């Protein structure tokens, strides 16, 4: 009996793995197709100066991708956003899917702080830069503040991936102080955001998604920046990093 069970398990496991791999390849191809199709109205919105039109497009885009990939998603801590007119999300960064998860699960309109290198991507880079996102480089301090204030006036909330880039592990790495600096300069509250599960779905360097994963966004209590000065950005960064670490560790 034990031998038969072992043989049965050995025969089933490779087949299950094969089905998951096929699902992953098909889901990746379809996700690329969805992206190409949805990029057309998004790019058109950017050309027309109608950045707000991008939000419903991204809702449809991310819904299609998440359903195709069999992703189970949830968000907790929305009560922390009550009473906030605008804010800066400060999050960890594990995967390209982080952006999709924020677009899909966060209420309101969210835009991102992106490095100038994104502009080199045809069509996508132009769309990102002209739909309310903040494109920065090392010399863009004053311009970043102006763009953040403009985004605030347009009703956008800004998301900042404070680790600087993606890491292919299950750790929270040291936060850069750029988000804290921008929040203090614009006097906007910071909301810590822990993103869990996206690294398993599509790790850095992976060409195909791993379907059937669970993604969770956890929002922490906002940290008000009114009255803070530039010298407070180190302490603010540490508080944000600690909050994200605690929420990330508590995520099953």
Question: Model regions: which residues?
Answer:
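A transmembrane-helix-recognition feature enriched in membrane-embedded lipid enzymes
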Residues: 13-74, 126-130
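Short, flexible loop segments at the rims of nucleotide/cofactor-binding pockets, characterized by
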Residues: 65-68, 89-90, 135-139, 169
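Membrane-embedded segments
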Residues: 96-147, 152
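Generic preference for hydrophobic
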Residues: 75, 89, 112, 217-219
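Non-catalytic C-terminal accessory region of glycerolipid acyltransferases
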Residues: 1-18, 142-252
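Generic beta-sheet signal
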Residues: 85-91, 110, 156-162
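Short, hinge-like loop/turn segments at secondary-structure boundaries
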Residues: 92, 129-131, 208-211
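Glycine-rich helix-loop-beta junction characteristic of Rossmann-like nucleotide cofactor-binding loops
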Residues: 77-82
């Amino acid at each position: 009996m034990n031998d038969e069970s072992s043989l049965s398990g050995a025969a089933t496991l490779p087949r299950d793995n094969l089905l998951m791999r096929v699902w992953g390849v098909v889901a990746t191809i379809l996700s690329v197709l969805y992206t190409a199709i949805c990029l057309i109205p998004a790019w058109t919105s950017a050309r027309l100066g109608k950045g707000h039109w991008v939000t419903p497009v991204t809702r449809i885009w991310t819904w299609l991708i998440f359903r195709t990939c069999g992703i189970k998603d949830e968000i907790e801590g929305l009560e922390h956003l009550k009473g906030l007119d605008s804010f800066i999300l400060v999050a960890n960064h594990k995967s390209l899917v982080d952006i999709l998860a924020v677009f899909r699960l966060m209420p309101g309109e969210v835009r991102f702080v992106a490095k100038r290198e994104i502009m080199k991507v045809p069509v996508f880079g132009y769309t990102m830069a002209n739909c309310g996102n903040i494109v920065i480089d090392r010399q863009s301090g004053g311009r970043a503040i102006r763009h953040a204030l403009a985004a605030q006036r347009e009703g956008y909330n800004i998301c900042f991936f404070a680790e600087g880039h993606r890491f292919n592990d299950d750790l929270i790495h040291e936060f850069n102080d750029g988000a804290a600096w921008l929040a203090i300069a614009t006097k906007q509250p910071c909301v810590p955001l822990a993103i869990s599960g996206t690294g398993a779905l599509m790790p850095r360097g992976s060409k195909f998604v791993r379907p059937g994963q669970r993604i969770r966004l956890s929002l922490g209590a906002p940290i008000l920046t009114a009255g803070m000065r530039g010298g407070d950005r180190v302490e603010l960064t540490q508080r944000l990093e600690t909050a994200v670490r605690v929420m990330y560790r508590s995520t099953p």
